[in-house]
Curated annotation (Swiss-Prot):
Source lineage: Bacteria, Pseudomonadati, Pseudomonadota, Gammaproteobacteria, Pseudomonadales
Pfam families named in the record: Cytochrome_CBB3 (PF13442)
Purpose of the protein: Monoheme c-type cytochrome.
Subcellular location: Periplasm
An MF annotation (GO) of this entry: electron transfer activity
InterPro entries reported in the protein's UniProt record: Cyt_c-like_dom (IPR009056), Cyt_c-like_dom_sf (IPR036909)
Chief location: periplasm
N-terminal signal peptide: 1-26
Keywords attached to this entry: Electron transport, Heme, Iron, Metal-binding, Periplasm, Signal, Transport
Positions contributing to heme c binding: 45, 48-49
Entry comment on modification after translation: Binds 1 heme c group covalently per subunit.
Gene transcribed to yield this protein: nirC
Any one GO cellular component localisation term in the record: periplasmic space
Protein name per the record: Cytochrome c55X
Amino acid sequence: MTVARHAVSRLGLALASFLLFPLALAAAPAAERQATLDHLLLQDCGSCHGLRMTGGLGPALTREALAGKPRDSLIATVTHGRPGTAMPGWNALLDEQDIAYLVDRLLEGYPKP
């Protein structure tokens, strides 16, 4: 292998590692933490959005209701809340991984009807 090819190969590996690093950070929480977060989703989120997430004080959070909404926007809403509404920000109690997990669960259609 020539020096140039070796350098390009190493650069490619470094770039791939850099691009995949955020995916490692976004790994799902441990199983015990997931159970805690699922409970929080049903009890805390469900107290405003309905136990089946079909709406109540807050809007519906069903898979259909969230269809087309950008994941990043949903994460920002859970993180910072919605000023002027009853929706609080959860960043004081939950970290980024927890919030991403909750949003992903809702996008997957949790809780199942």
